Amino acid sequence: MFTIQKPDTVSHLSHFHESKSLGSLPFPSDKERKQDTNFNILEETYDKNENWSQDKKGGEEGENKSKSEDEHSSLDNNRSQLKNRPIGQLKSTGSEGISLSSSEEEVRSPPEGAEIMQLEGDTPANDTANGFEKWAGSPLEDNGYASSSLSIDSPDSVSASTWQETTLPAPTTTPQENPETEDSDVESSSDSDSISVTLSEAFQSLQDKEKLKEREKEKHHAQLTMYRRLALLRWIRALQQKVRDQQNRLQESFDTILDNRKEMLRHMQHGYNKTPTKEAV
């Protein structure tokens, strides 16, 4: 699942690693010193965070019972607070719990050169549960950790409750059919039908009018052509009559010319016959 390896160098804890080891530090008293998860060097008596829940050498059983009762009460309070939290905060607190538990394991990890400690099998669930219980602060000595996500004993139960609350089915309302809407639908359908009928009739009438106009144009064109033909024929006949009249006039003039010629010849012959008789007398 998760593999936690202690880094070779820790930047934010450099002032602890650069100094001397814990065993070589001088202290005014001979009591046993221990190191908590916040890297605070304290005496055997603990007053904050997880230190109150750790076992003391030579402690009494009554104190352990009171501590367990305080843990249960703090867990109940934390559960009630977590129910009111949104899902995003639960996710962030879950990640914070994982990081803090990993820091606790780093404190307990072996020194440099040892093998990497792996959390596999049945141990991860127990270690994480113990880590959550140890990090839970008492209600009297709350330093900000009691209300955090480290006091969650079973994340599955909390996540199940929150998801059940958030994923409630939305109420679906079935639309009721009103008679007014039906009447309006019927009226709209009838109106659409009437509009379509009127449009079709108007289109048909327009087509008929266009056809009539075309027919009238064709008739007018035919009549115009016939009138033009008749006018042309009349003009031709008039020309023919004029030609005939001209021919008749020419014929008459020719006849008069012939008559005049005959008379002239006659007069000429009659005058030639008279002249020799006079000479003979």
UniProtKB/Swiss-Prot annotation:
The keyword Coiled coil is assigned to this record: yes
Similarity annotation: Belongs to the UPF0500 family.
UniProt source species: Xenopus tropicalis (Western clawed frog)
Polar residues bias: start-end ranges: 1-12
Entry keywords, A to Z: Coiled coil
Coiled-coil segments: 198-257
Identification of the protein by name: UPF0500 protein C1orf216 homolog
Basic and acidic residues compositional bias, start-end: 45-74
Location of region: Disordered: 1-197
Annotated Acidic residues bias: 179-190
